[in-house]
């Protein structure tokens, strides 16, 4: 392969043809087998444990298969343990639904199903004055559906809210969590009977259909970009969420009540003298998104996409590919090699990295630590505060993709006398801004498609 590249560069030099070479194997985007998982794009994952206080507790978390490194261990007191609807406790009737009890058993290993175009679930909670605050749908298979949530008043059902769910494109180019939960914040609605009506595009299996009194960050999985837009051409409004549900202060977790107990973890074990009361322990850790460069040969040119925020990791990637060509091909045989190429962006995003907390403090002026709970949909402080943090998160992702990744690539290229040639856009949910992103390149380019929808972007 290097001999072929050498021949191309030498011939181009002899014929005075300017050459550009992609920054790594494949056209999208920046990765290879030399990138270690700890140098790759990563996301924040978590595990949860419920404990009762009043003394020292020894908590051992199962070791995650995708574990890279611990981040933070946070604890908060569950002053108001809000119930979820359970098939064993509450009265549930359905139409067009199979094995509904498995969807309301709290077990992600069991499934029920929606078996036809239209279906409905009606619930009469056993708890008097049940207050519905959230819905969370965990699907086991792809789903595209529309939901209408209703409460019974004066003998008739009236709509509280409606929403859609789309988990149909499962490839990790559209997010590291293909079947990410669909989480919806519901205006606080007290009632004795609720109905959810559904229009579904195809049969699907559901792990959990959670109707709960517990508040949730609306569309949190989408807001942390674990699941991105499901078509090649996202529009402006697709990354703007208009849910304005607010919860009473005593229903959410206060920042003041979150305790950082990271010093108490050793590997997978937390030993902590737990104060009185019921507590939730959240162990957060980094995991690889698993996204690789493409198209590339497995076992040869394919490997993890490099961290978008870490310039040292980017330099390692650059030196391992571009640097190797420079070392192997004599300077006189590559005089017309002018550009390093970055193609259209098709590799989703990371939402965590080694310097996350320090960067956040220096650029946004506050400590993000308590708000890490919002990655799991836990409302911290208020809906507004939680959403503002997640906006800052996405702002950081966009800024660093532009300035640290493309800006970093440009600086590396300039040191070797190259320019950067960039296609300043991406498909399926680009985690940045085209103008800001392209502004870090020396040259930008477009393309024209004769068919299909990929060219619309």
Question: Where do the PLM segments sit?
Answer:
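Aromatic-lined substrate-binding rim segments of carbohydrate-active enzymes
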Residues: 1-16, 268-275, 281-282, 409-410, ...
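Hydrophobic or amphipathic alpha-helical targeting/insertion segments
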Residues: 2-57, 142, 185-216
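The substrate-binding groove and active-site-proximal loops of carbohydrate-active enzymes
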Residues: 1-3, 33, 37, 172-175, ...
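Acidic, His- and aromatic-enriched active-site or binding-groove loops in soluble protein domains
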Residues: 3-10, 34-81, 215-220, 224-244, ...
């Amino acid at each position: 392969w290097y001999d072929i590249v050498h021949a191309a560069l030498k011939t181009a030099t002899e014929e005075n043809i300017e050459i550009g070479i992609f920054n790594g194997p494949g056209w999208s985007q920046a990765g290879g087998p030399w990138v270690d998982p700890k140098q790759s794009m990563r996301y924040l994952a978590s595990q949860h444990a419920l404990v009762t206080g009043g003394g020292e507790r020894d908590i051992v978390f199962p070791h995650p298969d995708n574990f890279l490194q611990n981040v933070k261990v946070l604890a908060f007191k569950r002053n108001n343990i809000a119930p979820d609807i359970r098939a064993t406790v509450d009265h549930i009737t359905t139409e067009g639904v199979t094995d509904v009890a498995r969807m309301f058993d709290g077990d992600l290993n069991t499934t029920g199903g929606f078996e036809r175009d239209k279906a409905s679930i009606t619930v009469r909670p056993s708890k008097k004055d049940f207050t519905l605050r959230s819905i969370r749908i965990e699907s086991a298979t792809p789903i595209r559906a529309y939901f209408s949530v209703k409460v019974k008043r004066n003998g008739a059902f009236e709509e509280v809210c409606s929403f859609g769910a789309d988990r149909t494109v499962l490839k990790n180019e559209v997010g590291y969590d293909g079947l990410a939960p669909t989480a919806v914040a519901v205006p606080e609605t007290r009632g004795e009977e609720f109905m959810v009506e559904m229009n579904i595009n195809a049969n699907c299996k559901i792990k959990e259909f959670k109707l709960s009194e517990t508040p949730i960050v609306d569309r949190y999985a989408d807001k942390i970009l674990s699941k991105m837009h499901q078509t090649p051409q996202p529009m402006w409004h697709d990354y703007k969420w208009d849910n304005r549900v607010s919860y009473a202060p005593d229903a959410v977790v206060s920042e003041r009540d979150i305790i950082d107990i990271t010093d108490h973890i050793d590997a997978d074990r937390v030993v902590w003298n737990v104060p009185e009361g019921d507590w939730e322990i959240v162990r957060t850790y980094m995991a690889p998104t698993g996204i690789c460069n493409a198209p590339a040969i497995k076992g040869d040119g394919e490997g993890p996409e490099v961290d978008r925020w870490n310039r040292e990791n980017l330099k390692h990637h650059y030196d391992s590919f571009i640097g190797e060509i420079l070392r192997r091909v004599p300077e006189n045989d590559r005089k017309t090699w002018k550009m390093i190429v970055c193609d259209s962006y098709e590799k989703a995003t990371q939402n965590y990295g080694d310097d996350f907390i320090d960067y956040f403090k220096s650029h946004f002026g506050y400590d993000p630590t308590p708000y890490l709970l919002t990655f799991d949909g836990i409302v911290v402080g208020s809906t507004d505060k939680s959403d503002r943090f997640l906006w800052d998160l996405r702002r950081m992702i966009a800024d660093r993709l532009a300035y640290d990744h493309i800006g970093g690539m440009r600086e590396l290229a300039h040191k070797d006398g190259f320019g950067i040639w960039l296609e300043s856009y991406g498909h399926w949910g680009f985690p940045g801004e085209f103008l800001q992103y392209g502004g870090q390149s020396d040259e930008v380019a477009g393309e024209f498609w004769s068919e299909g929808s990929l060219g619309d972007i």
